[in-house]
A protein has these predicted regions:
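Alpha-helical transmembrane segments of multipass membrane proteins
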Residues: 26-34, 57-61, 91-100, 169, ...
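Short, Lys/Arg-rich, polar N-terminal cytosolic tail immediately upstream
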Residues: 1-11
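Residue-level signature of transmembrane alpha-helical entry/exit and packing/kink sites
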Residues: 15-23, 46-54, 80-88, 122-127, ...
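Alpha-helical transmembrane segments in multi-pass membrane proteins
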Residues: 13-68
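Transmembrane helix-loop-helix hairpins at the membrane interface
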Residues: 123-229
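Structural signal for the C-terminal ends of transmembrane alpha-helices
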Residues: 63-73, 195-197
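Short helix-terminus and kink motifs of transmembrane alpha helices
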Residues: 34-38, 100, 143-144, 148
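Juxtamembrane helix-loop-helix connectors linking adjacent transmembrane helices
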Residues: 40-50, 69-134, 220-221, 226-229
Length: 229
């Protein structure tokens, strides 16, 4: 009787993980759309490729999450503790700025520079999408779906799960090219994974991600504009 109960629980959990895997593959498929576009490089140069991809990912992923996944274990809002949030955000800032300073590498990625150089409304559209939209579906996919998948496959090993998820998170950011950026992304992802584990949900990692992108974008924009003033 106990074996039958265990098998039923295992089957149900396996079904849930299969749904999460489908969500992750949807994200990957949309992310790699530029590889199949003949004018992908031209769209990127004009600053149009990023908003197209982000918009597509959001309009497909968020509704599916809201309808099918938001009530599943670890995929809801979770709890929120300001002290934990503040500590983790300080850690993210240290990773973003102290680590490059210590390593002696302070150059801005070419993609980030190209975003700052975009004129008029294109820059602001990209900035709004980067700050408020991308973090929502990225956390749904990585700290939500992919975390659940890996946690199941790795026998409930939280640390191993966080490492694998963070490796995947850094790798899919195809707009970057330098190894130190991928290291920073990996460490930031570990911090966001800690937020997910501590809060047992996605609200805290989403808000951390939004605030991080806002600070980084604001500082880069200020650094770009100051020499011109």
């Amino acid at each position: 009787m106990e074996d039958k109960k265990y098998s039923c629980e295992y089957i149900e959990r396996n079904k849930a993980v299969s749904g999460c895997f489908a969500m992750f593959m949807l994200f990957v498929g949309i992310t790699f759309i530029p590889s199949f576009l003949k004018d992908g490089a031209e769209l990127m140069a004009k600053g149009l490729l990023f908003p197209i991809i982000v918009t597509l990912e959001f309009i497909f992923i968020f509704p599916l999450y809201y309808i099918f996944f938001r009530k599943r274990e670890g995929l809801g809002l979770g709890s929120f503790r300001f002290k934990t949030f503040f500590i983790l955000f300080l850690l993210i800032l240290l990773i973003q700025y102290l680590l490059p300073y210590i390593s002696g590498v302070n150059e801005t990625e070419s993609w980030s520079e190209s975003q700052m150089a975009l004129g008029g409304y294109i820059f602001w559209i990209n900035a709004i999408l980067l700050i408020f939209i991308a973090p929502v579906y990225e956390e749904i996919i990585f700290r939500g779906c992919l975390f659940n998948i890996t946690y199941f496959w790795f026998g409930n090993n939280v640390f191993g799960t966080a490492v694998i998820v963070s490796m995947m998170f850094s790798v899919v950011h195809l707009q970057y090219t330098e190894i130190r950026t991928f290291i920073v992304l990996f460490l930031v992802s570990l911090t966001l994974s800690a937020a997910r584990v501590k809060s047992r949900g996605l609200l805290m990692p989403v808000l951390l991600h939004i605030l991080m992108n806002a600070v980084v974008t604001g500082i880069q924009y200020a650094a770009y504009m100051l020499p011109a003033s």
